[in-house]
From Swiss-Prot:
GO molecular function, one term: isoleucine-tRNA ligase activity
Key words, A-Z: Aminoacyl-tRNA synthetase, ATP-binding, Ligase, Nucleotide-binding, Protein biosynthesis
Residues holding ATP: 610
Name of this chain's protein: Isoleucine--tRNA ligase
Length: 1081
């Protein structure tokens, strides 16, 4: 007998988080990630682009979710024979950084930055760019993601910035860049314009004013146009009123004021909500008749513009009948529609709308009455002013969704600004075509959300009036007539005469000038910097320093990406900018495959908020339940279908309890069984793969089933991972683990322990080892820690030279299915057995008959003989699991079930029209049991010369009541119909008593912490239980076989033996008192 075994004892209750820490140390010791890259360097490349986060804040659950999905896909690709470079990236410029510095230094406007010095300001920004980089690295590593931080890219690096310049010059040279004045979303909080897609990121429900303002007509001060506005602060900039020329308008006499009001007829009820009879209609006319009529301006600030045609009625299609008065106040400096209609009517020049609001949202001196006042605070002052002058007729408010700055969280305004644009509208058709070439998961995000966004693209305002960013490389003359775009550091040196350039930020290059080629003196760089989204969209080029450090041949091997993945919000962010730049430069989609994940919400269903503290720290949850549990919880959720989900720690705990612990127990049981085999044989166990998969030699049907099931699983995982369907892969893997633990091991526990001989034990051990090993490998990209932990132990018994032997599980290849073992029929047959067992238990529970109590028989009812034949290998298992000595078969379902087919007359009428006549209706409504069986089996039936389908009927089955009374219970579920005979004779009752007795003994052994191999004696006292005593004595050998330990009357107790602590127990069996006590032998 061997005294030394291969494996050490495993923990009864594992500490998964602690084991993860051990695995992290192991990976560091063997340099696992770099080893994986080295081992696959000659494999075909699998290109992955990582979207760059800002390091000015800590990673949140959204980052960890996206990172987990990326890690799963990249690990799988690497284990599938691909070389997967995974470079981390950092967004280093833009509003997130500047906003932090402005808060830190108390900066409120541009002049304060200039006074401080751009160089000092940018130095402050640079100092915090990587503030949390080490924490990011630590947390990302802790969450099991293998990604290269040492070879990361940063958008502030000179090489990256130079590639961005090159990208931009390509677009400039193609005529896709222009400067213009447009009304754009503007952040007063950050003092800069935002792009249209940035405005989509932070909408909030707010209360805003809804005012009806009276504008005096020029010809009669007592006649007034009633206009609507929701932005009182724009009224000082009013230059026109806009109507819809097709609407019907009215002139009414107001009963209270005796003044005349003009507004759309359909909006009268809105003005006279409180006094329905408070007016009299004097005139009706079309809106077109109002065009050109003049009115008196509310404020005098732009009175001089009257000579340009201002302060008159214009027509515009954007005026609607569902709100307001049918007359809209027009301030062309603060509304896109206002601007366009004003330019179209020549009341302003395209580059000269009035904008009397400074960069931080305060009125300039032009608006003398409110100079220096913040616009939203001016609302109430303007309302008061108008009310005192009798011009405010309705002062109310309304709720609506309004965009806020994604960085400063202040309400945006729309403001006319001079900006630089990319002609995305010129790329629209190509963008739409390229979008169709990519493969998105889920599809709706591509075909719906993203396609809709592309259908409505506007030109991209990529310039920002900020400081910490990549400077736009355009040098211009004072009149903007001469424009030079720079595409490289060398070109900048050549044109400016600079000898050394070590940094491209504003403070390093803004002093450089270029001599004019047209006699205009010198050209100076424009003031603006790039929108940081332009930089992240340029990352395929920037991270490689293309085309300076990498040629086209090498770059084309890495473009487009094989895979990217981010949250659904990036459909209007990174996914979009990647596409715009890629389409502009190469007319190509920048990625082949994309997984879009949903948004992680707090447990209360609201957005996660640091200030509200409505979510737990990810590291805290990891320390409680494990990183693997968090990973599996998130990727087995609606999140991988791009849907929202509330993150609940209870869900993570459920993964640990319901998946990891049973899986661990299966693994532990395998280790214990191998140890038992080694002790029994005196040999060292070594996994024999060939023995485990040779189904011609596997005589046990459950062995064949679990091996074939595992091969089908391998095949399924490969197919679905090729489609990037994580939402299909994870549930199937979990289902397999459940089958492994709840069925295979439970049905074969005694074989695996050696109760059926060493040969059977070795066979079952090899089978169990095979499926645990293969399923662990399949799970390894998803849950890298627990799988590594299992594998490091299992590899001790994998023979040298085996394809399963590597230093780490993550160096192994994903298994390929053995085609000869792919057999869905075997799985289907086993599933039928499972369904019978599960439903029979349900029927027993319904009648409150304990599973410990044997029943007379179980009849399986199905009209198909093939169904019964498919169960022949599993009859013994059904008998054991249902606790019955007899399984009967019945094919005549009509004896037990009344079937009825109810035709869908409406559907059939629509399909057949007049052909669905009286005779056919009668035939359809009177199908025989045989007809219904034919319909169910074949899916159709011929009636009166017409073929009707199963979908044309509703099939009902009613179980005959005579089989659900007394000792009988009849029921059905799916294709399973069962009849239980719950009667018991004396022999069955006796077996039931024994089973209850042995069950209590086994529970006591487990409760006292005894191990299977402990030498013990079980003492029992049944002097007060004559029925149980008789039952035990009648089948003592079988009882001892179940207990596997000597069973001795308590009266013969050996006083010299040590009693097992807490093993003395008295319990009831069929109202008889029994006592047991256990001693060490």
């Amino acid at each position: 007998m061997a005294s030394k075994t291969t494996f050490k004892d495993l923990q009864e209750i594992p500490d998964f988080p602690k084991e993860e820490e051990n695995i992290l140390k192991f990976w560091d010791e063997i340099n696992a990630f770099k080893q994986q890259l080295e081992k696959t360097k000659d494999c075909p490349p699998f290109t992955f682009y990582d979207g760059p986060p800002f390091a000015t804040g800590l990673p949140h659950y959204g980052n960890l979710l996206a990172g987990t999905i990326k890690d799963v896909v990249c690990r799988y690709a690497s284990q599938n024979g691909k070389y997967v470079e995974r470079r981390f990236g950092w967004d280093c410029h833009g509003l997130p950084v500047e906003y932090e510095i402005d808060k830190k230094l108390g900066i409120t406007n541009r002049q304060e930055v200039l006074k401080m010095g751009v160089d000092k300001y940018n130095a402050e920004c640079r100092s915090i760019v990587m503030r949390y980089a080490q924490e990011w690295r630590s947390i990302v590593n802790r969450f099991g993601r293998w990604v290269d931080f040492d070879n990361d890219y940063k958008t502030l690096d000179l090489k990256f910035m130079e590639s961005v310049w090159w990208v931009f010059k390509q677009m400039f040279d193609k005529g896709l860049v222009y400067r213009g004045c447009k009304v754009m979303p503007y952040s007063n909080g950050c003092a800069t314009v935002l792009s249209n897609f940035e405005t989509q990121q932070n909408y909030k429900e707010v209360d805003d004013p809804s005012l009806f303002i009276a504008f005096k007509t020029a010809e009669d001060p007592k006649t007034k146009f009633i206009a609507w506005t929701t932005t009182p602060w724009t009224l000082p900039s009013n230059l026109a009123l806009v109507i819809n020329k097709d609407f019907d308008y009215v002139k009414v006499l107001d009963a209270k004021t005796q003044e005349h009001y003009i507004l759309a007829e359909c909006r009268l009820p809105e003005l006279y909500k409180k006094d329905k009879d408070g007016y009299k209609i004097l005139e009706k006319f079309k809106g077109s008749e109002l065009v050109g009529r003049e009115y008196e301006p509310l404020f005098p600030y732009f009175l001089s513009r009257k000579q340009d045609g201002c302060f008159r009625i214009l027509a515009g299609d954007f005026v609607t009948a569902d709100a307001g008065t049918g007359i809209v106040h027009c301030a062309p400096g603060f509304g896109d529609d206002d601007y366009k209609v004003s330019v179209a009517n020549n009341i302003i020049k395209p580059d000269d709308p009035p904008v009397p609001v400074d960069e931080n949202g305060h009125f300039t001196n032009v608006v003398s009455d409110f100079a220096g006042v913040y616009i939203k605070e001016a609302d109430k002052l303007i309302r008061k002013n108008l009310k005192e002058r009798g011009l405010l007729l309705v002062d109310s408010s309304f709720k609506h969704n309004y965009p806020f700055c994604w960085r400063s969280d202040t309400p945006l305004i729309y403001k006319a600004v001079h900006c630089w644009f990319i002609k995305v509208t010129a790329l629209k058709d190509d963008l739409l075509a390229n979008n169709k070439k990519a493969y998105w998961v889920p599809k709706f995000a591509q075909e719906g959300r993203f396609n809709n966004w592309l259908q409505n693209v506007s030109d991209w305002c990529f310039s920002r009036s900020r400081f910490w960013g990549n400077p736009i490389p355009i040098w211009v003359s004072e009149d903007f007539e001469e424009v030079v775009c720079i595409g490289s550091v060398e070109e900048l040196k050549k044109l400016t005469g600079a000898t050394e350039i070590t940094d491209l930020h504003k403070d390093f290059i803004d002093h450089l000038t270029i001599p004019s080629q047209k006699g205009k003196g010198v050209l100076r760089r424009i003031d603006e910097v790039f929108d940081c989204w332009f930089e992240s969209g340029s990352m395929p080029y920037g991270q490689q320093h293309y085309p300076f450090s990498m040629n086209e041949e090498e770059f084309s091997k890495r473009f487009p990406a094989d895979f990217i993945g981010e949250g659904i919000d990036q459909t209007r962010g990174w996914f979009y900018t990647l596409n715009v730049i890629s389409t502009a430069l190469r007319n190509s989609n920048p990625y082949k495959n994309l997984i879009v994940n949903g948004i992680v919400l707090a447990a209360d269903g609201k957005k996660m908020s640091k200030s509200k503290k409505n979510y737990d720290d990810p590291l805290l949850i990891a320390s409680k339940y494990s990183v693997d549990a968090i990973r599996l919880y998130m990727i087995n959720s609606p999140l991988v279908r791009a849907e929202e989900m509330s993150f609940k720690s209870e869900g993570v705990f459920a993964v640990k309890k319901d998946i990891f612990l049973p899986w661990y127990n299966a693994y532990k049981f395998l280790i214990q069984s191998i140890t038992r085999w080694e002790l029994a044989t005196g040999k060292d166990y070594m996994f024999n793969e060939q023995l485990s998969v040779d189904t011609t030699k596997l005589t046990n049907p459950t062995d064949r089933w679990i091996i074939i099931s595992c091969q089908n699983l391998i095949n399924y995982v490969r197919i679905e991972m090729e489609k990037y369907h994580l939402y299909n892969v994870v549930p199937r893997l979990i289902h397999f683990l459940e089958n492994l633990t709840n069925w295979y091991i439970r049905l074969n526990r005694n074989r695996l322990k050696g109760d059926y001989g060493l040969e059977e034990q070795e066979t079952s051990l090899n089978v169990l080892f095979n499926v645990i090993l293969n399923s662990t490998i399949l799970m390894s990209p998803l849950v890298p820690f627990i799988t590594e932990s299992f594998y490091q132990n299992l590899r001790k018994v994998i023979p040298k030279g085996s394809s399963y032997l590597e230093e780490s599980i993550h160096f192994l290849r994903i298994p390929t299915p053995k085609q000869e073992l792919l057999d869905e029929k075997i799985e289907r047959n086993f599933e039928r057995m499972q369904n019978i067992i599960n439903f029979a238990r349900t029927l027993r529970e319904k009648r409150k008959v304990s599973l410990k109590q044997p029943i007379m028989s179980l009849t399986v009812i199905n009209q198909d003989q093939e169904f019964h034949d498919s169960l022949k290998d599993y009859i013994q298992y059904i008998e054991d699991e249902i606790n019955t000595p007899s399984i009967l078969h019945e094919i005549n379902t009509a004896n037990y079930v009344d079937l009825k087919a109810i035709p869908n007359h409406k559907l059939l009428g629509q399909k057949l029209g007049k052909e669905y006549n009286k005779d056919l209706k009668a035939a359809a409504g009177n199908l025989s049991a045989k007809d219904i069986e034919t319909l169910k089996t074949t899916g159709s039936i011929d009636l009166v010369g017409k073929k009707l389908l199963l979908e044309d009927f509703t099939i009902t089955q009613n179980y005959k009541k005579e089989y659900s009374s007394g000792d009988l219970e009849l029921g059905g579920e799916g294709e399973v119909i069962l009849l239980l005979n719950l009667a018991q004779d004396e022999k069955l009752k006796s077996k039931g008593l024994v089973r209850e007795f042995t069950s209590n003994v086994q529970k006591t052994k487990k409760k006292t912490g005894l191990k299977v191999d402990d030498n013990i004696v079980i003492y029992y006292d049944v002097t007060k239980a004559p029925k149980l005593n008789a039952a035990i004595q009648s089948d003592l050998e079988a009882v001892q076989k179940v207990l596997k330990k000597p069973l001795v009357p308590l009266s013969e107790k050996n006083a010299a033996l040590k009693i097992v602590e807490n093993s003395l127990l008295t319990f009831q069996v069929d109202e008889e008192s029994v006592t047991i006590e256990i001693a060490y032998a």
